[in-house]
């Protein structure tokens, strides 16, 4: 990988990690279209540490209050007394499914499931699921049912959205896409679904990044250029990722996810067309 490729892929990661369009899909598609080598699942996981930093900075106040609530609850012997402490434990519980399934299906995630064919299918299927979630949300609104806010999230919502997050192990599905979709099915407002999605991502993204750093430590230490390129890609991913978070949170206050649904379908169908005509290898 060249430095130029690292910069481009870092920007791609930052742009697509938080939008419900799948960063893994784009990190697979862009190199394929450009004639570059697939950076691999390990690259994706490590560069996500940059976008993790973006979440930490953007949601600093939320994270600080949640962390303080958890420790205060432990010290007082009442770990679930406050909304902040409960949120911390709910995020931890919601993270368990993706951790367990990620370890069980690590080989498939890094090999066969990275096929452009399966990525295209995942892009389209999740778009249809998101369409259904939007339709249900509109029906509830027409009936006068108010959407839930962060204060309304309970154990049921946290665990079900956590289960939905495990679907993101399939490249092309999108971690933010499946968690936002899960949130909409559970009647969270779009903004709330996105906000909880980003907070829920912290433990899983951190764990995946650290694990892949450990797994590839010998390769990285043996090649200074690989280490530099990875650092540059991670930096660009963090900077662009911060802007993507701000954009999506503000966008969903006033708009539906229709734009992302149309994009996912167009991209998925387009890739299948390129594969069918021999322009891309699955």
UniProtKB/Swiss-Prot annotation:
Gene Ontology MF: a single term: undecaprenyl-diphosphatase activity
Subcellular location: Cell inner membrane
Keyword Acetylation: no
Broad class of enzyme this protein falls into: hydrolase
Keywords: Antibiotic resistance, Cell inner membrane, Cell membrane, Cell shape, Cell wall biogenesis/degradation, Hydrolase, Membrane, Peptidoglycan synthesis, Transmembrane, Transmembrane helix
Pfam families named in the record: BacA (PF02673)
Membrane topology annotation: Multi-pass membrane protein
An example Gene Ontology CC term for this record: plasma membrane
GO BP terms, alphabetized: cell wall organization; peptidoglycan biosynthetic process; regulation of cell shape; response to antibiotic
Enzyme Commission no: 3.6.1.27
InterPro entries (alphabetical): UppP (IPR003824)
Note: Bacitracin is thought to be involved in the inhibition of peptidoglycan synthesis by sequestering undecaprenyl diphosphate, thereby reducing the pool of lipid carrier available.
Function: Catalyzes the dephosphorylation of undecaprenyl diphosphate (UPP). Confers resistance to bacitracin.
HAMAP family for this protein: Undec_diphosphatase (MF_01006)
Name the UniProt record assigns to this protein: Undecaprenyl-diphosphatase
Species: Chlorobium phaeobacteroides (strain BS1)
């Amino acid at each position: 990988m060249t430095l130029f490729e690292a910069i481009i892929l870092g920007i791609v990661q930052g742009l697509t990690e938080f939008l419900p369009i799948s960063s893994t899909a784009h990190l697979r598609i862009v190199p394929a279209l450009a004639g570059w080598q697939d950076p691999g699942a390990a690259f994706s996981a490590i560069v996500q540490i940059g976008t993790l930093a973006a979440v930490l900075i953007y949601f600093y106040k939320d994270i600080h209050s949640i962390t303080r609530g958890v420790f205060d609850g432990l010290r007082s012997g009442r770990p679930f007394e406050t909304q902040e402490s409960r949120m911390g434990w709910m995020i931890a519980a919601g993270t368990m499914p993706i951790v367990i399934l990620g370890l069980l299906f690590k080989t498939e995630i890094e090999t066969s499931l990275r096929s452009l064919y399966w990525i295209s299918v995942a892009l389209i299927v999740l778009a249809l699921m998101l369409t259904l979630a939007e339709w249900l949300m509109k029906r509830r609104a027409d009936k006068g049912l108010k959407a839930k806010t962060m204060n309304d999230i309970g154990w049921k919502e946290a665990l079900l959205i956590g289960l939905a997050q495990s679907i993101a192990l399939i490249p092309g599905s999108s971690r933010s896409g499946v968690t936002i979709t899960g949130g909409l099915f559970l009647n969270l407002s779009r903004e709330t679904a996105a906000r909880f999605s980003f907070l829920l991502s912290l433990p899983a993204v951190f764990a995946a990044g650290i694990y892949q750093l450990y797994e590839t430590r010998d390769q990285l230490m043996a090649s200074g250029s690989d280490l530099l390129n990875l650092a540059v890609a991670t930096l660009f991913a963090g900077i662009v990722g911060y802007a993507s978070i701000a954009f999506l949170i503000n966008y969903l206050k006033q708009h539906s996810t229709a734009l992302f649904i149309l994009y996912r379908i167009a991209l998925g169908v387009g890739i299948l067309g390129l594969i069918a005509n021999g322009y891309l290898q699955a």
